[in-house]
Amino acid sequence: HIGGIQAFLQENGDADNPVIIGVDEVWYNAFSQIATEPKQQGSVSGYLRMVLQGKALQGNINSKSGSHDISVTQGNTVAELLLGHGYHWNERFMGRAVCTENVETVMLSDKIRCNLLNPGKEELNQLVNYWISDMKRNIRNFKIYDDVLYNAAFEGSLVNISTEEHEREIKNISSSGIQSSDYRKINIVEWETRIDHSITNRSSISFLLQYDDITLLFPGDCPIQLFQEKLPKYIDVVKLPHHGSWANISREFIKNTSVSYYLLSTDGEKYGHPSPSVIGSIMDEAPIPAKIIKNYDLSQLETIGETEGEALWKSKTKN
């Protein structure tokens, strides 16, 4: 996700003269907004700077070729791109972190209401404390100074943490080898009840969008279980969290929530997404017939749902 946003911000250019699309505001939590530890006087130097630069390289799209030149990250982190290109950043939160304790409801227009569901301060504190603890394992006397390099290092570290967490969960969620005709035969009882404990996923920005009588849920990668009790019993559109992983949506939610459309965003090539139990439950246990809209025509879901292109074409022909 970080790499995609970096690429978009680089290509879109200046916020006042965008190449691709105009963006009114960006919600993004950088280290400088969520870190609560007091900053030290002085500057970053020596071994500390070297370690921070190494962490920063892990998350930059321009360093994937194997380059160890820190200059490739300068000006190219999400935080620096937002500032450098003049984007309005977390303005609805008065420049502070996007979290439920700061602002819970945002009116995007007279008719569009955004209810923030996640993260809370607890999730953000866990995230930043994990990173600080990791840094202290590398640097005994780790200190925080007022330097943009901390944002870059934090951003790069989270990409690496997220990848490691995905690798650990593959065996639990894999759908490889399962054909579309088999999803209805899956034994739902085998659905794992473990909730995703990934600190990166649990700090995802999640929100419920309401326009007139239309309701849309965008949980990001956060497990829906964290805010399930706050949700209405009917939702028009739900974007499946974490590419349809079983650890990020509960069987209870699918069985008890009337959803018209589930959006599935995955190419199916990494980590075995989507989880067969999730697809099987939507097909057989949802209280009303729900349509699955895919952004890729996955071979394992060949006869299930529609691609976004097909859905858009049908919508246009109806009108």
Regions found by a protein language model. Give the residues of each.
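C-terminal regulatory/interaction regions
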Residues: 212, 222-225, 229-235, 252-256, ...
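Flexible, acidic/histidine-containing loops and adjacent segments that form or flank the divalent-metal
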Residues: 11-214, 290-291, 295-296, 306-319
